Amino acid sequence: MRSSLVGSEMCIRDSYPQFGGPTTASTFDALSDELQGQRWLPDLRFVSSYHDHPAYIKAIADSIREHWESHGRADKLVLSYHGMPKRYLLEGDPYHCQCIKTSRLVADELGLSEDDYMSTFQSRFGRDEWLKPYTDETLQGLPEAGVKSLQIICPGFSADCLETIEEIGMENRDYFIEAGGERYEYIPCLNATANHIDSVSYTHLRAHETRTHR
């Protein structure tokens, strides 16, 4: 990137649907550092989040529907997001609110009631209080509450990684089964599906249209 830039416009969209200071903002900071020293810059447009974009919501909902078609529905759908210290929320970071909105919109798209789904937060570490409810503790308590089968998805990840495959797909499955659960299914991330590619295209298109119609 430091060699040269071509074109009149540049649209930057990272792979984090929900905006977070430690993720999205730090990505934009790193990009700004890379742009320093350029002799010329195109018009820049940052897509700060797409947590509520209809194409993204539909892509998540469709992946859940496809799983239901093959495996049937479970007692509970859990939408688990990467956690962060609660102090970020108290300082005004919109991440938590955007995660909750994503879950609500996906549930609306699927026609779910509030009892059918829940949002949780994973991967905490250290001594600080993190966003709640915690995924691991929640899954350990669900069987006692009568939930014997669940399906879990991570809408905050564009593609599967060690965190989703091992922590959510394996470790948390053990927590649920050992606590008395009977059926645990991890629904993969969007990865390279056609719906995901379409949602990327639509968010870029909206960013361009927003700029040209200002």
Regions picked out by a protein language model, each given a short descriptive name:
Residues 1-9, 204, 211-214:
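Single conserved hydrophobic/aromatic residue that forms the stacking wall/gate
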Residues 8, 13-206:
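Extended amphipathic ligand-handling, pore-lining, and cofactor/metal-binding catalytic surfaces
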